Amino acid sequence: MDYIDFLKNKMAISHNTGFDINDDELTPTLYPHVKDTVRWAIKGGCRAIFSSFGMQKTVTQLEILRLIVKHEKGKCLVVCPRRVVVEFETQAKEHLQLPVQYVRTMQEVEACQADIMVTNYERVRDGELGVRIDPQYFTCTSLDE
């Protein structure tokens, strides 16, 4: 076996587990690099996006979740540091005219009218009075930072 074959045997291939979207489903005002990232992530399914500061990661996440809700129905959850929650709410409204709601308990989750909810890591890890937000309730869960 030569070195190139050795390297090829070491490569892990990430298979697509998502779905295709049409270009007209994307929010038209998104930057081209955001549209490309959204298409790639939606088609791939389980994907991580490691974009630099200022590359609209929050908007990218929200657009991915919006399209997942459109195609798969159900609810989506963003789990992020508490200091980032307001950014998600603001970016969703400003760039996508999308309602996003902060939730603290499973009771709030179950009563929430928004398709996309945001909470902080402590609510999932520790909960409130021992009751944690259960990510399995959601069609999709997205982790930020």
Residue positions per predicted region:
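SF2 helicase/translocase NTPase motor core
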Residues: 1-51, 55-145
